[in-house]
């Protein structure tokens, strides 16, 4: 059984027991989170596709940790002008473990 749900403007395909990194959620570590924006649920031969969401569909997850991703370096450069600018960015994330998928 797997599901596709939406969180933080992105879509994630998950199954029970999977660990997923999402955009940062303001939730304490160890707590339970429910995602109700479920776009698709597949259970063996049966596939429920939402229009746009599956009615009654829910993905339940447990918050494992919070952290920051790898550093991305941004470089701005203007040729022949002796101008260059270098910046970095590390995006916050929340790691969750999928515990249940309800149709």
From Swiss-Prot:
One of its GO terms (cellular component) is cytoplasm. One of its GO terms (molecular function) is structural constituent of ribosome. Keywords: Ribonucleoprotein, Ribosomal protein, RNA-binding, rRNA-binding. Pfam families: Ribosomal_L21p. One of its GO terms (biological process) is translation. NCBIfam families: L21. Belongs to the bacterial ribosomal protein bL21 family. Part of the 50S ribosomal subunit. Contacts protein L20. HAMAP family: Ribosomal_bL21. This protein binds to 23S rRNA in the presence of protein L20. This is Large ribosomal subunit protein bL21. It comes from Shewanella sp. (strain W3-18-1). The lineage of its organism: Bacteria, Pseudomonadati, Pseudomonadota, Gammaproteobacteria, Alteromonadales.
């Amino acid at each position: 059984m797997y599901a596709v749900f939406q969180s933080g403007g992105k879509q994630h395909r998950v199954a029970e027991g999977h660990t997923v990194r999402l955009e940062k959620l303001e939730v304490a570590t160890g707590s339970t989170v429910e995602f109700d924006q479920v776009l698709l649920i597949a259970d063996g031969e049966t596939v429920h596709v939402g229009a746009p969401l599956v009615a009654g569909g829910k993905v339940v997850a447990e918050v494992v940790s919070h952290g920051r991703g790898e550093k991305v370096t941004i470089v701005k450069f203007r040729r022949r002008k002796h101008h260059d600018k270098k910046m970095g960015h590390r995006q916050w994330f929340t790691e969750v473990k999928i515990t249940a998928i309800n149709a």
